[in-house]
């Protein structure tokens, strides 16, 4: 899948789940299941409930995503 095919949206982390998964509520009200991207995992970026994040969604499955950025 090419980088141009993804959908990037902003949201808020609602709750942490096991295995670095998070429930994220998007700005449009949808809730998605998201995991941390590899670069964030390598740099030990901490994500807590209430954090604003950028989530990358695949057009094929809009219920799962990847957290690619945590806003300061």
UniProtKB/Swiss-Prot annotation:
InterPro entries: NA-bd_OB-fold (IPR012340), RNA-binding_domain_S1_IF1 (IPR006196), S1_domain (IPR003029), TIF_IF1 (IPR004368). This is Translation initiation factor IF-1. The gene is infA. One of the essential components for the initiation of protein synthesis. Stabilizes the binding of IF-2 and IF-3 on the 30S subunit to which N-formylmethionyl-tRNA(fMet) subsequently binds. Helps modulate mRNA selection, yielding the 30S pre-initiation complex (PIC). Upon addition of the 50S ribosomal subunit IF-1, IF-2 and IF-3 are released leaving the mature 70S translation initiation complex. It is found in: Cytoplasm. Component of the 30S ribosomal translation pre-initiation complex which assembles on the 30S ribosome in the order IF-2 and IF-3, IF-1 and N-formylmethionyl-tRNA(fMet); mRNA recruitment can occur at any time during PIC assembly. One of its GO terms (cellular component) is cytosol. SUPFAM superfamilies: Nucleic acid-binding proteins. It comes from Syntrophomonas wolfei subsp. wolfei (strain DSM 2245B / Goettingen). It holds the Pfam family eIF-1a. Its main location: cytoplasm. GO terms for molecular function: ribosome binding; rRNA binding; translation initiation factor activity. Signal peptide: none annotated.
